[in-house]
From Swiss-Prot:
It comes from the Archaea. Belongs to the UPF0047 family. This is UPF0047 protein MJ1081. InterPro entries: UPF0047_YjbQ-like (IPR001602), YjbQ-like_sf (IPR035917). It comes from Methanocaldococcus jannaschii (strain ATCC 43067 / DSM 2661 / JAL-1 / JCM 10045 / NBRC 100440) (Methanococcus jannaschii). It holds the Pfam family UPF0047. Gene3D superfamilies: YjbQ-like.
Length: 138
């Protein structure tokens, strides 16, 4: 058995202060390039005002609802003690999380029919990066 470990770095430009950007094609590309058939992919964002999440990718209103609910739950102008203007983004990032792990089966991400992998931007627009670590066998 040959264990493969590869790290991929991607950069994206977000367009709004808060949005969910579909990064599923990047993950599929990393898995394909790694040639791993069975294993895991860890998707990680090294930012304190962004996150990674998995959710429905068929109906765009789901992305809208997630952003709206988080904004309702954590309003931008709440009474924060961290006063740099992006305090809400730090809390949203903590709730969403900075990584996701997915299973690779038969050379593809094991996702549900409607699932996609999203970069969650909470303090954009700006240039961002995320990493994909692939571990598995050919």
């Amino acid at each position: 058995m040959l264990v493969i470990k590869m790290l991929f770095k991607y950069q994206i430009k977000t367009n709004k202060r808060e949005e969910l950007v579909d990064i599923t094609p990047y993950i599929i590309s990393a898995i394909s390039e790694s040639k791993v058939k069975d294993g895991i992919a860890v998707i990680y964002v090294p930012h304190t005002t962004a996150g990674i999440t998995i959710n429905e990718n068929a109906d765009p209103s789901v992305k809208h609802d997630i952003i709206n609910f988080l904004s309702h739950l954590i309003p931008k102008n709440w009474n924060f003690t961290h006063l740099e203007g992006n305090s809400d983004a730090h809390i949203k990032s903590s709730l969403v999380g900075c990584s996701q792990t997915i299973i690779i089966k038969d050379g593809k991400p094991l996702l549900g029919t409607w699932q996609g992998i999203f970069f969650a931007e909470f303090d954009g627009p700006r240039r961002r990066e995320f990493y994909v670590k692939i571990i598995g066998d050919k």
